[in-house]
Amino acid sequence: MNFVNLEQIENSLRNATFCMLFLTTFLYWFYTAFYSTNPQQIINPLSLTNIKTNFTYPDGFQANNINVSTTYLPINPVLNTEREEQPEANGTNGLLGVSSLVVNLKSIAIPRIMMGVSNLLLVLLLLVRWEKSGHFPLSNLYESLMFLAWCCTFLYLLYCTSFTLLVEKMLGSLIAPCSLLMNAFATFSLPKEMQQASPLVPALQSNWLMMHVTVMIISYATLIIGSLLSILFLILFKHKKGTPKKYDNFINNLDALSYRIIGLGFPFLTIGILSGAVWANEAWGSYWSWDPKETWALLTWLVFAIYLHTRLTKGWEGEKPAIIAAVGFLVVWFCYLGVNLIGEGLHSYGFFN
């Protein structure tokens, strides 16, 4: 393939990714808002068996010793505390059962498949970009935004089967628009020159490029997802006053899931900072220069280190560490994008121009 064909393919993939993410966002919002989830679908016993709560379900209904609660939604589903018998394979009950199963599968399968297609389109976009430029596509802000969007969708697809059905929909309703905004910002706001593939600048011609930048972007994506869950937890926690205690289990599971994901992203952030220090010593002769990007990366590390520490402190469960994670969400974005607005420092390849 020649360069012209690759240029056309890249433009087509970028437009297709934007459209697919837009449709995915709409579907996740639609299913989260209008699809009623029954109690049996809220707790996934295969993935949350290690989460313990002190809450006792009113009628004693349990699944693998995990209490099952209804969801906290503007539209409250009807609670059915009795186990439903499996419908017969023939007759009206059988047909209704099959119809219900088909609707249930479609409700989660369609947006999940569309998220997967979006992820695949982003992969193809990055591969075409790699072929055009001759290097791993992380040399400027445009490429890193596309890679960050891919990381967010990939992590969601990687963990979605571990989420409960409702958490999967709610998290998809957050990740899909975030990825859409990344794609839109990279496509419509950044200079056209940045969107064109170009050779690496001398400072980036190193094997550390893939190691350092890739790990940092993965850590950003993971911390963003975990922080979004903490923000969602805070919203539900604030409005749970006056609601039955049966909602507490679902809210607490959100908090526990946020902790698990942030706990995964923190080591990536640590490795990314350390690898960046080694690369800086090779390129600039110093492990640390207090560059704005370095300083804010350190602040990001400190915020989430405090978050993880408070999770181990008695009396700091729930709302307090979630507030720290919410602050971390803002710090991550400023470290990634906000610092670039300053236009100063050694990380000039990440600026907006």
Swiss-Prot record:
Main location: plastid
Membrane topology term: Multi-pass membrane protein
Other comment: Met-1 is the initiator; however when Met-1 is mutated a low amount of protein may be produced, probably from Met-20.
Record keywords: Chloroplast, Cytochrome c-type biogenesis, Membrane, Plastid, Thylakoid, Transmembrane, Transmembrane helix
Paired cysteines (S-S): none
Example of a GO cellular component annotation carried by this entry: chloroplast thylakoid membrane
All ranges on the Lumenal side of the membrane: 33-208, 279-295, 343-353
Record field: transmembrane: 15-32, 209-233, 261-278, 296-313, 324-342
Stromal side: 234-260, 314-323
Record's keyword annotation contains Transmembrane helix: yes
Mutagenesis / variant outcome for changing W290A: Reduced amounts of c-type holocytochromes produced
Recorded family membership: Belongs to the CcmF/CycK/Ccl1/NrfE/CcsA family.
GO MF annotations in UniProt: heme binding
Name the record gives this protein: Cytochrome c biogenesis protein CcsA
Lineage of producing organism: Eukaryota, Viridiplantae, Chlorophyta, core chlorophytes, Chlorophyceae
GO terms for biological process, alphabetical: cytochrome complex assembly
Outcome recorded upon mutating M1D: Almost no c-type holocytochrome formation
Effect of W296A: No effect on activity
Location in or out of the cell: Plastid, Chloroplast thylakoid membrane
Primary role: Required during biogenesis of c-type cytochromes (cytochrome c6 and cytochrome f) at the step of heme attachment.
